[in-house]
Design a protein with these regions (language model features):
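PRPP-associated nucleotide enzymes
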Residues: 1-181
Length: 181
């Protein structure tokens, strides 16, 4: 699942920026992990190790999910599906709304992004409240995909996002867990 001494090496590579984007928030910055080639390779290998069964597509959530999705897809012999902010994809799309702290946002995929029944692994850098990830699952399922697993570098378990995904039948894996927000 997450953490333990097994991933202490990766935890050390993730920078914490206090009070960003607002007071009281501890921003977990993976750019320092990405700068380290051994850390990046290790994170990718460990994310790959938690994948269960065959996968047809790896769906990366914009933007940092795009970092890990192609590497995982190549290793799994799968395609990459990009989940973008609404309005960023040309052509026909389907979209799903999700709530933010102060409003609503929307994500989208192309209408032909996945075949009905496609087995999809959802990937992002971090899960907090799970709003974006849950919207991504709804969107993919609306497109006919079978989403049964999600993989993250970081989980903020106190915010409940991973548990919310589990309640929707998703197996959730994260490399490290951090306390707080």
């Amino acid at each position: 699942m997450a953490d333990g001494d097994h991933n202490a090496d990766l935890r050390r590579l993730i920078r914490t920026i206090p009070d960003h984007p607002k007071p009281g928030i501890q921003f977990r910055d993976i750019t320092t992990l990405l700068l380290d080639p051994v850390g990046l390779a290790t994170a990718t290998e460990r994310m790959l190790a938690s994948v269960e069964g065959p996968v047809d597509l790896v769906a990366g959530i914009e933007a940092r999910g795009f970092v890990f999705a192609p590497a995982l897809a190549l290793a799994l012999g799968a395609g990459v599906l990009l989940i973008r902010k609404d309005g960023k994809l040309p052509g026909a799309t389907i979209a799903e709304d999700y709530e933010l702290e102060y409003g609503v946002d929307r994500i989208a995929i192309h209408v032909d992004a996945c075949a009905p029944g496609a087995r999809v692994l959802l990937v992002d850098d971090l899960i907090a409240t799970g709003g974006t990830a849950r919207a991504a699952v709804r969107l993919l399922r609306k497109a006919g995909a079978r989403v049964t697993q999600a993989n993250f570098v970081i989980d903020l378990p106190e915010l409940g996002g991973a548990d919310a995904l589990r309640a929707e039948g998703i197996t959730v894996s994260a490399l490290v867990a951090f306390d707080g927000h």
